[in-house]
């Protein structure tokens, strides 16, 4: 839908604003596996394992994610001092936190056999982003802030849907917190972080070179042009997600 809405973005956002938004979303995608310890991968793997208690998976994955988010929040003054994402740093942190949890719960849904829920969640989030973009950009004319708010609210909509349709938070139990199981999950997930980071570097690092040499506005133009090849990447991700489940099950 981001491809379909490109005319909307280019009309209501300046190239500089769109460049800033693109840098925020790109950096969030890099930070998710680092902040969460790549735990969503472990959630899928252990949730698919019939010999593992899913409640333990939910509980310990949530604790790991919360620790990562809290540590990131503690770094807020330091990040603010560097003027990274000046004036939109708080939105960046909120978007990061919500995406960490939506990703974890979505992977739990897949591992729990709720593939339809996983698929519908993607569609609901996409629809929410589209409608909220139109509301905040066209109706309220809030520009950059409106775009970021729409992304955060779309993540909240996704979280609400996943909370209603999966037993994730119902399965959470403080009694099941286990350091040994958290270590086991992290032992599986942490080695996947370099892979995620390197794929991110291949696909997204060019934006930072453009930012450094040409500025934010040039990155906005690049981000718009990049929507076309992103469609091919999206099609590839469908097969990749199906392969992940088959790999664990077999």
Where are the language model's segments positioned?
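Interhelical loop/hinge segments that connect adjacent transmembrane helices in multipass membrane
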Residues: 90, 116, 140, 144-148, ...
